[in-house]
Amino acid sequence: MSEQISKNNQIKDGPTLSEILRNNQRWASETKERDPAFFERSATQQHPKYLWIGCSDSRVPVSQITGTAPGEVFVHRNVANIVQAEDPSCQSVLEFAVLGLQVEHIVICGHYKCGGVHAAIQGTATGKV
């Protein structure tokens, strides 16, 4: 990977698009080798117990931080994990999760040092955030 860590433990740059695509191909191959029926099973209707509404922050990958597999959590992400009645995207996710998938739990999860929450509290948010 081309990712480099600076002196203050910040990621300087991430993987290239080619690396992301190669990683995806490797993941698919390894997954199929471990579980030959995975993709066929995943192509059928999902049955997650949870709807997770979380932040879009790239440092908060839902499956990794919850230890869940594909299909176990239905996810909606936006800046600062906002739920607003006027947001058609969020409302469609809620409706599909509750009425279509019949999830049992809705989790709204924030994270430490969220830039979106900080901007809202400080009054420095721009646009619709």
Regions found by a protein language model. Name each.
Residues 2-3, 7, 64, 69-129:
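Short HxH-centered metal-ligating active-site micro-motif
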Residues 2-84, 88:
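Short, conserved "active-site rim" segments that organize catalytic pockets and cofactor/ligand binding
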